Amino acid sequence: LWRYKFTAITRLIVSLLVLLAVFQGTEFMLCGGLALEGGTWSKIGYGAITLLPPLGIHLAYLLANKKPGKVVAFAYTTSVLFFAYFAFATQAISGHTCYANYVTFNTANGSTIPYTIYYYGWLFVGTFLTYMWAPTLHKHRKAALYALMTGYLALLIPTTTVTILWNEAIAGIPSIMCGFAVILAGLLTLKVAPESIKLKKTHHSFHFKLPF
């Protein structure tokens, strides 16, 4: 990515990759027991993955040359609410367990269903938008959106399958999902970024309107 000129799109791609790397790093720290307490690493990891869905939605809008509006604003708003909850609520994350292939997190019962709806909901929205917009666009935008959609499906399909087959794996959904996120990271780096560099139209930026 260092070869490419930084645009709104490449900044979003870099942000997604950094957050994925942060979560992978926190898993290593949790199970390696380095420096910080496990609860601190859990909060850092959950904070990182909570910010991923709105960034993906925002990226889809820019790749499709759509102006980010209420949907993107709502995605960011919901992510900030969950981010604040996991960062500051005392009992939001009470512990973790390390397994061979993933980590489970003990989260407050009241947050499990809302957070699952939040995460899967925005992933489905992103998949739907990329599927709906891609066929109507020229080749570079189409290729980038289809690559992003493939990345979404790489998260949704394996994770959903695992949790259906092994109900006890539900607590490990964030860890399992980010295990498959290497596919998304590869697509962002090798396909979405190169295709986005070929785009000629001006990208829409995203700004919140202040009431003053």
Where are these regions (language model features)?
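Individual alpha-helical transmembrane segments in multi-pass integral membrane proteins
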Residues: Y4-A92, N106-V125, Y152, I170-L184
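Hydrophobic membrane-targeting alpha-helices
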Residues: Q24-F28, L59, L63, L129-W133, ...
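Membrane-interface helix termini and inter-helical loops of multi-pass transporters
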Residues: G95-F105
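Juxtamembrane membrane-water interface segments of multi-pass membrane proteins
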Residues: L1-K5, Y61-V71, L129-Y146, A193-F206
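Interfacial "cap-and-anchor" motif at the non-cytosolic start of specific transmembrane alpha-helices
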Residues: T26, H140-F212
